[in-house]
Amino acid sequence: MTRRIICQKLGKEADALNYSPYPGELGERIYNHISEQAWQAWLSHQTMLINEYRLSLIDPKARQFLEQEMINFLFGTGSEKPAGYTSEKE
């Protein structure tokens, strides 16, 4: 049976994640309050950030930037798109 939660990002009941996707307390917070659908939306947004800003994941500053953007996206007011960004769908 799939675990259901009230997703903090979506503001509605949704399927929960099957495992903690991130280490530490933040990972537990994500596991307990963020749905699979919201997590997938974050992964897509994260990919866009990595590509648009040409981030190297071996750079500690890039990882710190992505972690802060993840917190903003999942729990805050949202993560901003890079200036001038337009998706292929638009």
From Swiss-Prot:
One of its GO terms (molecular function) is iron ion binding. GO terms for biological process: cellular response to oxidative stress. The keyword Cell division does not apply. Pfam families: Iron_traffic. The keyword Transmembrane helix does not apply. One of its GO terms (cellular component) is cytosol. NCBIfam families: PRK05408.1. HAMAP family: Fe_traffic_YggX. Could be a mediator in iron transactions between iron acquisition and iron-requiring processes, such as synthesis and/or repair of Fe-S clusters in biosynthetic enzymes. PANTHER family: FE(2+)-TRAFFICKING PROTEIN-RELATED. Belongs to the Fe(2+)-trafficking protein family. This is Probable Fe(2+)-trafficking protein. It comes from Coxiella burnetii (strain RSA 493 / Nine Mile phase I).
